[in-house]
Amino acid sequence: EQKIVNEALVRMSRETGIPLICTNDSHYIYKEDAEPHDILLCIQTGKTVLDEDRMRYEGGQFYVKSPEEMYDLFSFVPEACANTARIAERCNVSFTFHELKLPRFDVPDGKTAEGYLREICYAGFAKKYPAAKEEWKERLEYELTTIENMGYVDYFLIVWDFIKYAKDNGIIVGPGRGSAAGSMVSYCLSITTIDPLKYDLIFERFLNPERVSMPDIDIDFCYERRQEVIDYVIRKYGEANVAQIITFGTMAARAAIKDVGRALAMPYADVDRISKMIPAELGITIEKALKMNPDLKHAYEEEDDTKRLIDTSLRLEGLPRHSSTHAAGVVICREPVMEYVPLSANDGQINTQYTMTILEELGLLKMDFLGLRTLTVIQSAVQEIERIHGIRLNMEELPENDSMVYDMICQGKTEGVFQLESGGMKQFMRELQPRCLEDMIAGIALYRPGPMDFIPKYIKGKNAGGKVQYTHPKLEPILENTYGCIVYQEQVMQIVRDLAGYSLGRSDLVRRAMSKKKASVMAEERGKFIHGDGDEVPGCVKNGIPIEAAEKIFDEMTDFAKYAFNKSHAACYAVVGYQTAWLKAHYPVEFMAALMTSVMDNAAKVSGYIEECKKMGIQLLPPDINEGYRQFSVSDGKIRFALAAIKNIGKGAVDALVAEREKNGKFTSLTDFCNRMEGGE
């Protein structure tokens, strides 16, 4: 058919004088990709290679052909190839990478963005630091100057604005997340609620003037109202200028084997046998599995069908299998998003066709609007406390030294407490015996694979009663809160700065090299740390630290740095953990009701929390059409079971029931209930 069409096109060209061009219909890159592409089509369309009524590209010629192949194919009309080349020469497109394309924030008339940011910051500074020291003002000024020089003023104003909108509209916002809590500007803008001075958090861990990269402020919102904040951003910056971000699910090793086996119409038992030979490890590949499992290697070498299955799977492994919308990512542009990136529709939602990594490389503003269930629990509990007790709590102003809260944590009674409710963490809290927020921060940072190895040393230091031995006295002010252990990335930066004289910006580069185990960089930095570089870094020896001590400190620091945690992030999560623990300790009924409401679609979790209520002496009342609500509710110090948590009863039916009861009074009998609800859901 194509041959007939081509002959007709040549004839039309000669009759009309319109020049010919030739093209190459390409669906895969290499000729040998024909079969894997055919298998991929089967996977995509739910067919097998044996199905006759399926989509296929027959002939194996739909690959990107070389210039020589194109000239050979169209040797009867060489001018067509020449014309195609002329068009290609006239086409020119270039992408500008790493150049910021931030949207502009509209400031009040007569003000500049820089001036407006300073105005808001200094107003916040005056409230948060009423008796401010000069050095604190200097830090704020340094941060503002750095932000201005790096071109991020609009970024901070944009984040400040939508967080202000959320708080003004009663949407609970988390205390912060990640390294942003190390910024005094973020704190003064109320983007974060963690005082960076109080917890020795470092600005350069968040924004490094010696390593230009986009700031990354991730924000947690009540998960039920997160979309309201996104909708506000869409209204403010324009629907065309805001889009959510695509994400791709790729074909992992086992999934690739199963999908390919299904497409090849292989017996299920054979495919299942091969897939189970692949170790269930994070990041496992088929190639690694062949080296690790001799049975798999033997099957590959001896069984023809298995060889075909694995060879084809190797070609498809890692390719995108499906696309979806990123759970939190939103891109905001100064012009319509389509001016910068291609778009696609997914269930009515406009998405970028580029992933967030590429968007960042293109200099576009990516924000993460995260929904955190725990914040919804806190907000629901606070509202219930106000309804029942008439007390309006401000969760940002809780006393941090509440012995009742720490007693509960030390006993491991942390079911439902953010970050502290796993069995292992409960046991750790019983061993750690935290008595302040610093202990909780360290606990969250330590309880991870890798750092867990240092837990015994940390607990030993904590119990030593101030008798911790330091390799050099200059380490004491840096490590005293963690009893001589390097727990945080910020401590690595402080050691490099205070002992060897690095700038904080450069110390962050060293920290990054350590965490990524860059041997060549580390060998170079080791010499600079100990002896200096004769220019910017004086080194430990010049600062009065013996060579042996400097070598030992660097080696220990390198070992710890592989696992060191971001203290800013741990501090934010410790605050949320403390808030939930405080609510559980002081208002257990309201807290447990809110907690169960947040998981009422998960029967197993509800059951677990019911058991916790029994241990706490909280009585659970059965569901009642005259007393109950959609959510778990508090009544006379007891918890009423949620109507919407009853299996096979929809939320719409519950809402209709409650609305009818509130409008016309309680139901007096089953007959009354049936008559009044007849025709409803």
Where are the regions that the model predicts?
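Metal-cofactor-binding active-site regions of metalloenzymes
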Residues: E1, H98, L102
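Charged catalytic cores and adjacent phosphate/nucleic-acid-binding surfaces used
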Residues: E1-V93, Y142, L157-E210
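A structural signal for short, well-ordered beta-strand segments and their strand-loop junctions
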Residues: P19-T23, T96, Q244, Q419
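Extended catalytic cores of very large enzyme megasubunits
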Residues: R90, V107-P108
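Noncatalytic, beta-rich nucleic-acid-contacting surfaces in large DNA/RNA-processing enzymes
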Residues: Y28, G60-Q61, L102, P108-E681
